[in-house]
Amino acid sequence: MLLAHRLSILTVAVLVTAALAGWPGNAQAAKSTECTKVGMCYCVNDDLKATIATRVERFRQIIADQRKAGKAIGYLSVPLTSTGGGNYNVNKEVAESAKAAVEKRFGADFMYVLNPATPDSDLPKGGGADYMLMWTAVLEGPDGFGDFDFAYFVGPQDFARYFGFDGNGDMVKLDQYFDKRVKSDPEFEKAVQNGLTKAAFRRYYALRASTTVSRGAHDEWNIFRMLNERRRADSKFGTGSQIPVLFEGRGVAPADAEATVSEG
């Protein structure tokens, strides 16, 4: 039912795209449907398919090299967009901080965390569907059963660590951070000029910043859920070989791990 629902929505999207392409001045890159091993289908830019394939192979090689070095491999799910008062560059720094914290906790000699905010993931002129095709292919691995030993979903405590929250006037700290950064970071200053307000920034990072409010993270959660469903149903894996899911560094309860979240 889930796949049929996805495909029906996708069919409508393809028809709408085709119709819009016929309007004057709508010179868009050609798109086509690509489906992954776990049954996720995306309407992607044909011009980016080769680039996406190259990126996927690059990430798979990184994973293989790190695993050959004896390391456990984790995937970091983190909100990166500036929706709702966030800032892309700040979120990127939080991702780097979270990756470093996880590797420090377990030991960098034995742990490697793939951070999707790496420059290697950039797709020139890529849209959401293009990025999701790339990351779905990376997450599911060559065999469609997952290429990671665990998934780490970033939560409020990961943001709190980055900002130095201590439970005493944390919104004040965000006000001070905002004022300092707008004076020292031209890109942040430009974001403010384009509409980012201190109030929205303060509310977002004090109350909302988490994979809970990230559309992409919702899709990644569902992908890992599907991978574990496939593993449970396959005799080569079984329940004992599911991919562990962590939120803010703590293991997710079985009932939660098997639950579907809203699509991004």
What feature does the model see in each segment?
Residues 30-264:
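Conserved catalytic or regulatory cores that recognize and/or transform ribose-phosphate-containing ligands
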Residues 11-22:
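Bacterial N-terminal signal peptides
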